[in-house]
Amino acid sequence: MEKYLSVTTLTKYLKMKFDKDPYLERVYLTGQVSNFRKRPTHQYFSLKDDHAVIQATIWSGIYQKLGFDLEEGMKINVIGRVQVYEPSGNYSIIIEKAEPDGVGALAIQFEQLKKKLTEEGLFQERFKQALPQFSKRIGVVTSRSGAVIRDIITTVSRRFPGVDILLYPTKVQGEGAAEEIARNIARANQRDDLDLLIIGRGGGSIEDLWAFNEEIVVRAIFESRLPVISSVGHETDVTLADFVADRRAATPTAAAELATPVTKLDVLAHLQNQEKRMVTAVRNVLSKKQEALKKCSQSVIFRQPERLYDGYLQRLDQLQLRLKQSLRTRISDNKQLVQARTHQLVQLSPVTKIQRYQDRLGQLDKLLGSQMALVYDAKVAEAKRLSEALLMLDTSRIVARGYAIVKKEESVVDSVESLKKKDQVTLLMRDGQVELEVKDVKTKEI
């Protein structure tokens, strides 16, 4: 009887065969990218031809080192190993290396980055800076030992002696070159005494020049405050640095010429031309002044110089007359002012003030005497009237006239309403007093 295998057993067997097959451990495969959608980490897609499809995987670390981005429909050559994925039973190729078929990976990467940066606008003319006419100090980012720096120094010294060249020794190819180029561009921009920056290197293969195609270098040039001249490779070599730089030069010598657009000979010629123009201008002015002097020497004033100051003599007489009149007026005004001030001083003199106060005091003394007499007479009359009123109120005088005063408990009784039957009262009379008891109280009818 036949023994039936489980799916798992069969899949494990197939996986074991795949893993141990020496032909599947390293497979060279060509195909067209299909079902590709770029992911942030690992990449999963298909490779196909006209008759078959195989699943493909590139781990993130491998993909980052490819140097180009996969695109849908791109034909690529890959090296990898074939494996079986047990849970699904599918087999796939794990890619360890890949490159575009027919076109180099660097060319693909160049076009992809160029497209990206073009869409961002980094290569637009509106961002290009004008190169200075006269540079005092030029920075150069290149190798210390290459011919580039020698050609630049020679050309600049010949065209305009006195311009300083500041070299930033830089690795221009190989691992880490792009980062160093970008770093030195940033360093140069930190200085305030640089007017211009030249970056470049000599010729070489696309791999040798690749550092100048790296995105970090392109962005460093774009962000440069200083105008940048790119001189990378030969005239036929084109890099992304050339697109973003403010100017491109085919050779280091051409870069130095762009950096010094005005030469020493140009300046000397300009100065000589200016000198000629100044000499001509001075001669013209001198000629005009001589002609004017000649005309002046023939004028009436020069023939009869005394007429030159006739008008001034007349003016002097007028001023003298006005001065005398002004002095007389000033003296008169001052006399009147002195008289007024003298009168004021007299009025303000202590003797005058004392006399006025004495006169006023005499007047007040007389007025006070008369007022005091009037007050005295009024007070005497008032005292007499009050005395008579007091006498009228004296009880002894009242009882002497035959009247009697009734008192109850030391209080004078002035109304029957203050009394009631059996009240004890005292009757004060002229020659004594009588103690009485009230028998009855009768109110006077009105």
Swiss-Prot record:
Gene Ontology molecular function: any one: nucleic acid binding
One Pfam family of this chain: tRNA_anti_2
Major localization listed first in the record, in broad terms: cytoplasm
Gene Ontology CC terms: cytoplasm; exodeoxyribonuclease VII complex
Entry keyword annotation includes Nuclease: yes
GO biological process, alphabetically ordered: DNA catabolic process
EC number in record: 3.1.11.6
Entry's localization field: Cytoplasm
InterPro entries named among the record's database cross-references: Exonuc_VII_L, Exonuc_VII_lsu_C, OB-fold_nuc-bd_dom
Catalytic reactions of this protein: Exonucleolytic cleavage in either 5'- to 3'- or 3'- to 5'-direction to yield nucleoside 5'-phosphates
Keywords attached to this entry: Cytoplasm, Exonuclease, Hydrolase, Nuclease
Entry superkingdom: Bacteria
Function statement: Bidirectionally degrades single-stranded DNA into large acid-insoluble oligonucleotides, which are then degraded further into small acid-soluble oligonucleotides.
Subunit structure, interactors included: Heterooligomer composed of large and small subunits.
Family that this chain belongs to: Belongs to the XseA family.
Protein name from the UniProt record: Exodeoxyribonuclease 7 large subunit
Organism (species): Streptococcus pneumoniae (strain Taiwan19F-14)
